Amino acid sequence: MGHLLSKEPRNRPSQKRPRCCSWCRRRRPLLRLPRRTPAKVPPQPAAPRSRDCFFRGPCMLCFIVHSPGAPAPAGPEEEPPLSPPPRDGAYAAASSSQHLARRYAALAAEDCAAAARRFLLSSAAAAAAAAASASSPASCCKELGLAAAAAWEQQGRSLFLASLGPVRFLGPPAAVQLFRGPTPSPAELPTPPEMVCKRKGAGVPACTPCKQPRCGGGGCGGGGGGGGGGGPAGGGASPPRPPDAGCCQAPEQPPQPLCPPPSSPTSEGAPTEAGGDAVRAGGTAPLSAQQQHECGDADCRESPENPCDCHREPPPETPDINQLPPSILLKIFSNLSLDERCLSASLVCKYWRDLCLDFQFWKQLDLSSRQQVTDELLEKIASRSQNIIEINISDCRSMSDNGVCVLAFKCPGLLRYTAYRCKQLSDTSIIAVASHCPLLQKVHVGNQDKLTDEGLKQLGSKCRELKDIHFGQCYKISDEGMIVIAKGCLKLQRIYMQENKLVTDQSVKAFAEHCPELQYVGFMGCSVTSKGVIHLTKLRNLSSLDLRHITELDNETVMEIVKRCKNLSSLNLCLNWIINDRCVEVIAKEGQNLKELYLVSCKITDYALIAIGRYSMTIETVDVGWCKEITDQGATLIAQSSKSLRYLGLMRCDKVNEVTVEQLVQQYPHITFSTVLQDCKRTLERAYQMGWTPNMSAASS
């Protein structure tokens, strides 16, 4: 009622307001007040919005009915105040009719008629009618309504205060019945609209307000007089809250008690008096218990034990790895091995299974040491992914030449083929690979007893892009097949032969003459002599040379190779008893880019180690294991003089004392000394780091 009778119009939601009676529905266009833009006024304490005018219309009839009059006559018997209506929608119409009946009962027929006559004969109405009669009847009615609003505002407020007392159900007055006509049934009455919160942030979704019991007016009131809030006088006990405070905003300071203490002597009688003072001072009267229960959007103060922030943001969603783009997941899965993808990741969900089946993971297949690999499996893999570029089937004994032929036929883009120790394969498989995969660049088929020169001839004639070959321990290969490869594959960069007794100096000469891009050459245990090795001096790009166990290799050939091959970085001369200290000294002086020198079981002494430490500034790895003439002096001097040494192999150098090695380990921690005891210690340390613990019970038993 307070906001309807105030001078400042209340901003209500844009909805059609119900008419108060049938007379208003006929005269509404003539009695509607003009809309005015409210002037900006400083914010005032928010008043409790307990209820609205039951007639819901700023018409002249509302002010006539609300005029002050004599108190209602006492009836034959008093009825107790009505209990608060239920909140259900089925009783909305009945609740509205009960409130309307109680407001009608507070007025007498004579009072309403007298009020109407007083207003119609008042000077304010006459002045308004005279001022607007010159324009039009519509403007006359409008001015009359404005005058009525100004004249009856204060009287309406007094009526509101008087209506808070006990009411009787006596029936509507005669004056009201005269204007209304037939009384509609309770079901036909319009349902009052919901109260709308007009504080700041009202449109933001908020939590359910916590309704605390209110014993006075202090819990819900925000105006000038709260009645019975906690002081002796009962007025203004709690400080006024700002009008834009949120409904459920937790207080920053300790909150005031929601209810006055039970021992307060003024908790019963003070509210009415204080409320009357507040109304006369321009404030708002305190609400009754029923009105407080019906006030849906009154300010509620949150309990400190259960704070509620109306502007709380929803909690962030739990991050899900499946929300990443597929390209990122594929990049992550690419770091997994084939076992981890097939046996772990692909079993998580269907999405991961599909990602694990992506074609890029099936370009490079490592099926080594898997006895489940059969011809049928190779056929299925080749049928599903025909873009395989690399496959490793080493130690797969359950397949045959047929599976390799199907794989080669369905994967013409194969670039790298590895099949170590597949003794069941023959020339048929290598011929199929050479025939269907012309882009082949790498062929490693070591330790295949059935491989002959026929397969090598097909490789040399059809695979012109071949760069890396490995035919170690293929005992049936001879110079015939090797020469065909040397003449047909001019882009060769790596060649490794091991224990191929049928390969002689002719093959070495052919590779040296036709393959100038060779960088890695290995003829370990082959029937090669110094006459064939000397041709390797033509290879200017040679960086790694493996001449282990070459029976007829002399020192002059080795020194000549080191002098001419300036890019040589690794030289392996193990198991050559003819290599002596003089050869090692030349190697240390001439090897400008040499970093690795392997001299296991050679005929050298401490002088070779001293020469390496004195003349070489690049050698980082030296292995002189099984050299019986190496002593503590050579190991100590090379460690002291060499600035680049990082590894010194002293395995089975029996003249080197272990105590000396322990001292060298402490003095030169940047150098790794390899002996039997030192290697055992490092192995145990790695085992401990990986979580291994010794079983003391088994050791004691």
From Swiss-Prot:
UniProt keyword annotations, A-Z: Cytoplasm, Neurogenesis, Nucleus, Ubl conjugation pathway
PANTHER family: F-BOX AND LEUCINE-RICH REPEAT PROTEIN 17, MITOCHONDRIAL ATP SYNTHASE COUPLING FACTOR B
Subunit structure: Part of the SCF (SKP1-CUL1-F-box) E3 ubiquitin-protein ligase complex SCF(FBXL17) composed of CUL1, SKP1, RBX1 and FBXL17. Interacts with BTB domain-containing proteins such as KLHL12, BCL6 and BACH1; specifically recognizes and binds a conserved degron of non-consecutive residues present at the interface of BTB dimers of aberrant composition. Interacts with SUFU. Interacts with PRMT1.
NADP in keyword set: no
Function: Substrate-recognition component of the SCF(FBXL17) E3 ubiquitin ligase complex, a key component of a quality control pathway required to ensure functional dimerization of BTB domain-containing proteins (dimerization quality control, DQC). FBXL17 specifically recognizes and binds a conserved degron of non-consecutive residues present at the interface of BTB dimers of aberrant composition: aberrant BTB dimer are then ubiquitinated by the SCF(FBXL17) complex and degraded by the proteasome.
Family: Belongs to the FBXL17 family.
Stated name of the protein: F-box/LRR-repeat protein 17
Alphabetized SUPFAM superfamilies for the sequence: F-box domain, RNI-like
The keyword rRNA processing belongs to this UniProt entry's keyword annotation: no
Region: Disordered, residue numbers: 1-20, 72-94, 227-300
Biased composition (Basic and acidic residues): 1-11
Subcellular compartments: Cytoplasm; Nucleus
Domain of life according to the entry: Eukaryota
InterPro entries in the cross-refs: F-box-like_dom_sf, F-box_dom, F-box_LRR-repeat, Leu-rich_rpt, Leu-rich_rpt_Cys-con_subtyp, LRR_dom_sf
Bias (Gly residues): 227-237
UniProt-reported outcome of changing residue 627 to R: Impaired ability to bind substrate proteins
GO annotations of cellular component type: cytoplasm; nucleoplasm; nucleus; SCF ubiquitin ligase complex
Pro residues bias locations: 252-264
SMART domains: FBOX, LRR_CC
Annotated GO biological process: nervous system development; neural crest cell differentiation; proteasome-mediated ubiquitin-dependent protein catabolic process; protein polyubiquitination; protein quality control for misfolded or incompletely synthesized proteins; protein ubiquitination; regulation of smoothened signaling pathway; SCF-dependent proteasomal ubiquitin-dependent protein catabolic process
Ranges where the F-box domain occurs: 318-365
